[in-house]
Regions:
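GHKL (Bergerat-fold) ATPase N-terminal catalytic module, capturing the glycine-rich phosphate-binding loop
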Residues: 1-186, 194
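GHKL/Bergerat-fold ATPase module in large chromosome/replication-associated machines
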Residues: 118, 139-158, 178-185, 190-628
Length: 628
């Protein structure tokens, strides 16, 4: 047969133009494509041999071999898979919409497709070789046939096919690399090894690298032994019952890169309309870059044991960015470059599954290893809280995972919402909480009445807590109540109610005087029912921005943050307030006391003083007067 010259299909010519101009973001991926195609061919031969044993003689080792020749700038990938005949070469390499694998699946539509292990659902990866090769030769012999063929192209608009002797079934692809530094790099032994181990380390068949012969001291050529490059086990593909705990921990060190042990993990295999595997780890320590906006996060994505990408963010929400692990899909379609995911539906289903498994693993740790979970929460709980304002699907699961300090917990101990509700005393209707500065919130004057009543208050001091509580409005049938806002509805005796009403009238004059002096800073002055030992405190109106939110927005550099006027509550039983009431009734000047009370209320809640010098001067005058 004479050499036949043929033209590529129009779509192929367009594809070649894209490839030559680097459609892929990373040129090294061409080798991943060739190895994947070789694995396809091996799968086909193995499968067809089940019905025709002559296609795979006993003892045949299905494998992939890689050779380099630096002097000739050649890279060769050989497999002993199904091979191709002339028609296959024209249809598979001359057109784009009819990949060999695609036709193979179509021909088997009435058979058990689940037994066919195929990856080549894209049909265009082969052409990526022209990013690095100026010429390509494909020498092949199809299983069950005797005539071999040679396909040749320089990546222009044409290709040639000729008959060529070949004794071994399979395909040998030779790349004549371009005369540029990037392309020549693909004859480097370490480079080839690195790429194969990175992308194809878990491929089912052995991938063997053959080093170039080197001269010894005598000038004689020495042939080095071949080296298998993919000796790793796809742990996530194994049954969970067959994997030991130490194996899980060792694999975490491979993918986690933090040198520690995971807090817990989840290993699953989903079957049905979609089939995929996942092995996800929850680290015990926060990654060093957990708060960097541009930090990479996500899972490693594989398709048919072929590595596709690191840090696949589509499989995890930002509030689970600390999770490490692997997802492998049987059904995930990828675009031409295999780097950008196409099917949102499939990705969404996998994502939902992974999120559920992570939350289940955390809940299991919380239920069975409470101390361990407490330690984990202190490391990464603040990230998990982001889930309350970033999603609406998993709020119930997240609520059960929350942990808080409270007025009833010892130092270092935390309480869950379940525990809080179970130990609520009779008469308590709501879940009370207070947000503030970490050092000040524990001694905030607003806690005094709650402690006296025996009501536990959750204490929050993370910057994200304000955002979280905007979505966290109830737990079961219990609503949350911020004790720094509005009135507190305590159950009161008739005598207590009468005393409160009486105090409003008795202290009306003092409240009005304080309001006049502090009018620029204070919305209202009123008698408090929440104070026991302190003279005063600041309360936020139900419709106003909290002091904590105001401070946080200013710290974030937001300009023109509106100043919220607060409510100053005074304690009618405190000696200072009694003394000031007497002054007000006697029409005496309150002097520096209003500024002193306001400043004390600010400091007690952890807020900064608007004018520290003025406050110090007022306190100094009062102390000096008391010393005389």
């Amino acid at each position: 047969m004479a050499t036949e010259k043929m033209e590529f299909q129009t779509e192929v010519r367009d594809m070649l133009n894209l490839m030559i101009n680097s459609l892929y973001s990373n040129k090294e991926i061409f080798l991943r494509e060739l190895v994947s195609n070789a694995a396809d061919a091996l799968d086909k031969r193995r499968f067809l041999s089940l019905s025709d044993s002559s296609l795979l003689p006993t003892g045949t080792q299905l494998r992939i071999d890689i050779d380099v020749n630096k002097d000739q700038k050649k890279l060769t990938i050989t497999d002993n898979g199904i091979g191709m005949n002339k028609e296959d070469l024209i249809n598979c390499l001359g057109t784009i919409a009819r990949s060999g694998t695609k036709n193979f699946i179509k021909n088997l539509k009435d058979s058990d497709k689940s037994s066919v292990d195929l990856i080549g659902q894209f049909g265009v990866g082969f052409y990526s070789i022209f990013m690095v090769a100026k010429k390509v030769e494909v020498l092949t012999l199809k299983a069950g046939e005797t005539q071999g063929y040679l396909w040749t192209s320089e990546g222009t608009g044409e290709f040639e096919i000729s008959e060529c002797p070949r004794n071994e079934v399979g395909t040998k692809i030779t790349l004549y690399l371009k005369d540029d530094e990037d392309s020549e790099d693909f004859t480097s032994e370490w480079r080839i090894k690195d790429i194969v181990k990175k992308y194809s380390g878990f491929v089912n068949y052995g991938i063997f690298f053959h080093p170039e012969p080197t001269k010894n001291d005598k000038g004689e050529l020495e042939v080095k032994d071949e080296e298998r490059l993919n000796d790793k086990t796809a742990l996530w593909r194994q049954s969970e019952k067959d994997v030991k705990e130490e194996e899980y921990k060792e694999f975490y060190n491979v993918i986690g890169h933090d040198g520690g042990e995971p807090a817990c993990w989840s290993h699953s295999h989903a079957e049905g309309s979609l089939e995929f595997w996942s092995l996800v780890y929850i680290p015990s320590k926060a990654p060093y870059n957990i708060w960097q906006n541009d930090a990479l996060h996500g899972l490693k994505l594989y398709v048919k044991k072929t590595f596709i990408m690191d840090d696949c963010k589509d499989l995890l929400p930002p509030w689970l960015r600390f999770v490490r692990g692997v997802v492998e899909s049987e059904d995930l379609p990828l675009n031409v470059s295999r780097e950008i995911l196409q099917s949102n539906k499939i990705v969404t289903n996998i994502r939902k599954h992974v999120i559920k498994k992570v939350l289940d693993a955390l809940q299991n740790m919380a239920d069975k290893e409470a101390d361990k979970y407490t330690a984990w929460w202190k490391e990464l709980g603040m990230v998990l809280k982001e889930g309350f304002y970033m999603n609406w699907e998993h709020l119930d699961e997240l609520k059960k995972l929350l942990r808080f300090e409270s007025t009833n917990t010892a130092d270092g101990a935390l309480v869950s919402l379940d525990e809080y509700v179970k130990r609520m005393p009779e008469g308590q209707k709501e879940i009370y909480y207070l947000i503030g500065d970490k050092n000040a919130v524990k001694s905030n004057p607003m806690l005094e009445a709650f402690k006296a009543k025996g009501y536990e208050v959750l204490l929050m001091s993370d910057g994200i807590d304000e955002f979280m509580m905007s979505s966290l409005t109830e737990f079961g049938d219990k609503k949350f109540h911020d004790i720094s806002r509005g009135d507190v509805d305590f159950e009161k005796t008739e005598d207590e109610k009468k005393a409160e009403e009486a105090n409003k009238g008795i202290f009306k004059g003092l409240c009005e005087n304080l309001q006049k002096v502090l009018d620029e800073d204070i919305k209202e002055v009123r008698v408090s029912s929440r104070l026991k030992d302190s003279p005063c405190c600041l309360v936020t109106s139900d419709d106003a921005m909290s002091a904590q939110m105001e401070r946080m927005m200013k710290a974030m550099g937001q300009a023109n943050v509106p100043k919220s006027k607060r409510i100053l509550e005074i304690n009618p039983t405190h000696p200072i307030c009694e003394m000031l009431k007497a002054k007000a009734e006697a029409k005496e000047d309150l002097g520096d006391w209003p500024k002193a009370l306001y400043g004390q209320a600010l400091l007690a809640e952890g807020s900064p003083l608007p004018n520290p010098a003025e406050y110090v001067a007022a306190i100094t005058k009062l102390l000096t007067a008391a010393a005389k």
